[in-house]
Amino acid sequence: MGNSETSCIWNSEESFFDDYHASRVLPGFAPDSKLRMLLQMADQAEILIAINAADIEKNKVRHDLGITYDEDVLRLIQEFRDKGLYVGSVVITQYSGQSGADQFKTKLEHRDIKVYRHYCIEGYPSNVPLIVSDEGYGKNDYIETTRPLVIITAPGPGSGKMATCLSQLYHENKRGIKAGYAKFETFPIWNLPLKHPVNLAYEAATADLNDVNMIDPYHLEAYGVTTVNYNRDVDIFPVLNAIFEGIYGESPYKSPTDMGVNMAGFCIMDDEACCEASKQEIIRRYYHALNRLAKEEGTSDEVYKINLLMNKAKIDSTMRGVIAPCLERAKVSGGPAAAMELNDGTIVTGKTSSLLGASAALLLNAIKVLGDIPHNIHLIAPSAIEPIQTLK
């Protein structure tokens, strides 16, 4: 690092490009809001992408995009570059000689992308004396950076973003470079109540990770102020504090909440709108969890947890306008059905037939409504569909 001072900002799993969860629960929040903010500091910022070697080895998939984590790293690099942001390097975390990680490293280097490796540390994260030593973080590659603001992001959770930040702080400090660390994530919103629908919606979104929102006891003790954080940050804070003390001599933070730079709670102008949007999101997540369970991608615990969150928010599935019409259409037709709410509030449904699935029928019916086309008009002639059905 050529500068006398650098800052590491740890980004959460939330996306810079398409944070649709935030846009759903905070009406008016653009999916790329964080990217726009970052672009204002583009000349000072450097992107570092972390990926876990184990995720490369097992071809872990981002289900929202249908691509593996290593493919997503390549996508992120191109996305950032297309936006005019500088991607400095990729760090492969928890490396222990995995062949898949070696192949990926070679692929990146052939594209002139710098690659660093961080290794497994025995007893991590509780063995602080070993972690903060030449045999712990000291074994990791020192990541050469050239700009004062380093943003560490990743394809998804468990990629090692926080550990990468702490390792880098250790190495910078050893080189006499003053470096800081902050957490850049939107949820949970620390200055909203624990059971506020926006924060409950975050729990629903992370039901598969078993995240739980809780009062930050360290912040309450230090400042006498009630704030909200999630269990993983609260549980790990004593360890982080000890690591910071090992690096700096003293910790700059008195609580997990202190580590964040989230000001979203101060931007809410219509709390009622956010509450309603968040309740709708919890219901949506409930059905998403049921779908994952049916496809054997999720667990019943995930469904039970979101159902409990619905009880906490005092809501049920009937509060989502498309549910009742969809169930009624399925009951009447005797097969799978689908429903959609248009921008003007109109509910459109579609049923399963010998020619079309429910989703295809729904889309065609929605086009008819939007185009004011009589329902008995065929947008696609049955004779055009039948050969496809025969082929299938």
What are the residue ranges of the model-derived segments?
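The conserved Walker
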Residues: G156-P157
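Amphipathic alpha-helical regulatory segments at dimerization interfaces
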Residues: E328-R329, V369
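Zn2+-dependent cytidine deaminase-like catalytic core
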Residues: T349-K392
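Flexible phosphate-sensing "switch/lid" loops adjacent to ATP/NTP-binding sites
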Residues: M1-T153, Q168-L327, L342-D344
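Hydrophobic positions on the alpha1 helix immediately C-terminal to the Walker A/P-loop
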Residues: T164
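Cytosolic beta-strand hydrophobic patch enriched in CBS
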Residues: A337-E341
